[in-house]
């Protein structure tokens, strides 16, 4: 990060003479090869989401989530009715392009266009969606929307510090760990220490390339098994990117 001094000799941050803010994401959908994200619609998505979430017999997909569990379709419908169409936190249903069915939700939140800060959160993926190309591409589409299309400077990922799957996902997706905010929230009758992860605009290019290579059809065999890991591809692209910067 560039640091400079003002007329008083004090250290100040880098100048942003051309910064005019980012755009609000709104509720516009996103589509890729495997996944499609559509603005959450109670009428269209509740039944499919309830069926998909019901694959989780134990209810563990709700442990680290501020919402749920939803034991009836009507309770999920009540939540989707309250969550859909909210500009402060636009929720999307994650659709499998092959089946056309919804099996997860994700949202943009903590949206601050004036500062160029936005977070991907509110994620709940049904067991059948987890660890699939559809799930990975859904997150990539949201990252692409925020960083490339809307011009955000900082993309955040936060989770309960004890939520090891979410922390592993953040690192796999190229986010960098920034620390833990202790006693940051309370939910479901317990304390939450929050782990913070972020990706900056200047870090996005090699991460984007890693995703694009991983999502390419040739990275998978006929059974859908990956040839190269996403984390390895991002690491490779980062090594090339920063080596080029050093030479320049």
Set out the residue ranges of the language-model regions:
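GNAT-family acyltransferases
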Residues: 1-132, 145, 149, 190-195, ...
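Flexible ATP-lid and adjacent glycine-rich G1/G2 motifs of the Bergerat
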Residues: 142
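Conserved GNAT acetyl-CoA-binding A-motif
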Residues: 148-158
């Amino acid at each position: 990060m560039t640091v400079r001094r003002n007329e008083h000799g004090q250290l100040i941050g880098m100048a942003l003479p051309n910064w005019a803010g980012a755009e609000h994401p709104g509720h516009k959908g996103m589509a890729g090869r495997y996944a499609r994200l559509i603005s959450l619609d109670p009428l269209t998505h509740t039944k499919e989401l309830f069926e998909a979430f019901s694959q989780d017999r134990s209810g563990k997909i709700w442990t680290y989530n501020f919402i749920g569990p939803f034991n009836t379709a009507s309770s999920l419908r009540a939540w989707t009715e309250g969550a859909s169409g909210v500009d402060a936190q636009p929720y999307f249903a994650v659709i499998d392009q092959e089946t056309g069915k919804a099996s997860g939700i994700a949202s943009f939140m903590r949206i601050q266009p004036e500062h160029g800060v936005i977070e991907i959160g509110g994620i709940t993926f049904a067991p059948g969606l987890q660890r699939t190309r559809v799930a990975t591409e859904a997150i990539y589409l949201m990252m692409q929307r925020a960083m490339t299309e809307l011009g955000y400077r900082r993309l955040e990922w936060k989770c309960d510090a004890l939520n090891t799957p979410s922390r592993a996902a953040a690192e796999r997706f190229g986010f960098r760990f920034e620390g833990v905010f202790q006693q940051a929230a309370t939910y479901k009758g317990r304390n939450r220490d929050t782990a913070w992860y972020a990706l900056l605009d200047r870090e996005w290019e090699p991460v984007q390339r890693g995703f694009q290579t991983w999502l390419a059809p040739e990275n998978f065999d006929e059974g859908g098994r990956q040839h190269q890991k996403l984390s390895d591809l991002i690491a490779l692209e980062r090594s090339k990117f920063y080596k080029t910067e050093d030479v320049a």
